[in-house]
């Protein structure tokens, strides 16, 4: 964002009677959102939620199957 010293305006501060006034806010909020996603570096790729790269040659655009683990224990029998 080019105006780093300027605080982010509060949501809804625009003039509700002039819808065109909201356009500037949309740009400001979109820039702030993008900077948050990229860690403040415009043009850099977003941070990955995973800390490692998966190997295995699967197609990354397809969802991976979920793996489940279910454990059961029989109740203790008193004798």
From Swiss-Prot:
Pfam families: AvrRpt-cleavage (PF05627). The record marks 12-13 as: Cleavage. Residues 31-68 are annotated as: Disordered. One of its GO terms (biological process) is response to nematode. Keywords: Phosphoprotein. The keyword Cytoplasm does not apply. Proteolytic cleaved by P.syringae pv tomato AvrRpt2 after Gly-12; this cleavage is critical for subsequent proteasome-dependent elimination. The modification Phosphoserine is found at residue 44. Induction: During compatible interaction with the endoparasitic nematode M.incognita. PANTHER family: PROTEIN NOI4 (PTHR33159:SF93), RPM1-INTERACTING PROTEIN 4 (RIN4) FAMILY PROTEIN (PTHR33159). Belongs to the RIN4 family. This is Protein NOI4. It comes from Arabidopsis thaliana (Mouse-ear cress).
């Amino acid at each position: 964002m080019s105006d780093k010293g300027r605080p982010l305006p509060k949501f809804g501060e625009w003039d509700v009677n002039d819808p065109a006034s909201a356009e500037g806010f949309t740009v400001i909020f979109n820039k702030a959102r993008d900077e948050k996603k990229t860690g403040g570096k415009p043009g850099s790729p977003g941070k990955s939620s995973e800390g490692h790269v998966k190997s295995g040659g699967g197609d990354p655009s397809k969802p991976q199957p979920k793996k489940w683990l279910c454990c059961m224990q029989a109740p203790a029998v008193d004798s």
